[in-house]
Amino acid sequence: MHPIQVPRRLLLRRQFLQVSGLSGISLLLGGCGLPLFESVVGKLSEPLNQKVEALLFNPQKLAPEFPPSAIEPEALLVNTFDFTPQINPATFRLKINGEVNNPISLSMVEIQQMPLSSMIIRHVCVEGWAAIVQWGGVQLRELLQLAQPKDTVRYAYFQSADGYYDSWDLASAAHPQTLMAYQKNGQPLSVDNGAPIRLASPIKLGYKQSKWVTEITLTSKLLPKKGYWEDQGYEWYAGL
């Protein structure tokens, strides 16, 4: 198994905002993607982000984590895109395909046999609220490595059982704190929170953290349909 090679030109946007002095704006507004924030930095498109990334992005830099005493059990609100799908964990398969040498389809039993990663992080919603949550699952990069991505891969697309879709840059998908989670606060993930498996990461806003993920497709290009909310005007990168 070979480690995923993350291209240097994929930008973690938060560091560009920090050095440019714009990060405080997002904090004052409760999250990126709000209208005023978009009017200020929304034009800083992905091509510009990628050009400056080589100077700024450390793909291994970790976001803050918290002690168990900081967990806020009731603070994570449940937002639904359309409906809550009912998925049988016994028959569920997570597919990873696209520009890979070894397309795979994994059961939850197979996923749960992989090393468990756990983190207590801040989940931040574009609506302006946040929650300290413990997530448990498998590092996404470990799953992607099983599919043997080709050297051309730059993006990961996520398809969910409810029809929701989104895409991430490969650097963020391969970040050590990006999980495919099947536990929340030490308990099996509930259906409302995305069971049997969902994205969880402290480096992206909440709408990037797809629930009920059924398929991950790796590509070399960012496709016209970038994400459900992004296609309606939300920021694509949505980094923290």
Identify what each model region corresponds to.
Residues 13-14, 19-20, 30-32, 47, ...:
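Low-complexity, intrinsically disordered/propeptide-like segments
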Residues 1-11, 15, 22-30:
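N-terminal secretory signal peptides
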